[in-house]
Regions:
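Catalytic-core segments of class I nucleotidyltransferases/pyrophosphorylases
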Residues: 1-74
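Structural signal for interior beta-strand "rungs" in well-ordered beta-sheet cores
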Residues: 81-168
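Short, flexible loop/turn segments with low-complexity composition
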Residues: 72-83
Length: 168
C-alpha cells in the first residue's frame, strides 16, 4: 500500500475483529480497506516529539535522548536543572554522600541514601535507593526500597524488564 502510518491508534471495538491475531499490518489489514470502501475516519498529525516505546531497548534509548537533550521533549516533567545539569525535584531526598552522574532525573518521591549512586541516564521516582546501591541507564518507579545494582532496566511497581543487550 502507498500509506505510511505510525503512532497511537484509538479504535472502535468492532475494528479489532479485522486485525489478524498473527503478525499483521494496520494499514494493509484495516485502514487500506476502509479507505478503498470510502469509510471516513479521523486522524491527527502531530509535529511534536514522538518515539516508539515498544520494548525496553527503545524505552531506555528514548530516556537517554530526552535526558541528554531535554528540549527535545518539551512536555517532559523536568524541574529546572541544577548546577550539575541534573533534574532533581524539590521534594526528592538526596543524602550528602550520595552521588549523581549527569544526567539524572529524581522525582518528588525519590530518595538516595548514603553512598548510593545514580546515573548516567537514570530516572527515579517512588523509590528509595539504599546505601551503596547503584542505578544507571535505568528507569525505576514505584519500587519502594531497593538495594544492589540496577542497570539497563525498567523497574515499575515490582516488575523488572531488562534491555536485550544487558547482562544479568
Amino acid at each position: 500500500t502507498e500509506y505510511d502510518f505510525t503512532g497511537v491508534h484509538i479504535l472502535e471495538p468492532e475494528l479489532l475483529a479485522d486485525i489478524p491475531l498473527e503478525e499483521g499490518c494496520m494499514v494493509g489489514d484495516v485502514y487500506g480497506p476502509m479507505l478503498e470502501d470510502g469509510v471516513e475516519f479521523n486522524t491527527s498529525v502531530n509535529d511534536d516529539f514522538w518515539a516508539a516505546l515498544d520494548n525496553p531497548d527503545l524505552f531506555l534509548e528514548t530516556t537517554k535522548r530526552v535526558l541528554d537533550d531535554p528540549e527535545l521533549f518539551d512536555q517532559a516533567p523536568f524541574p529546572e536543572p541544577n548546577e550539575e545539569a541534573n533534574f532533581v525535584a524539590m521534594d526528592a531526598e538526596l543524602d550528602e554522600e550520595a552521588e549523581l552522574e549527569t544526567p539524572v532525573f529524581l522525582g518528588r518521591q525519590a530518595t538516595l541514601q548514603a553512598d548510593a549512586s545514580a546515573g548516567p541516564h537514570a530516572v527515579i521516582d517512588g523509590t528509595t535507593i539504599g546505601p551503596h546501591a547503584t542505578v544507571e541507564r535505568a528507569v525505576i518507579y514505584g519500587m519502594g526500597d531497593v538495594e544492589g545494582e540496577w542497570a539497563d532496566c525498567i523497574a515499575v511497581a515490582g516488575e523488572v524488564a531488562h534491555a536485550s543487550d544487558a547482562s544479568d
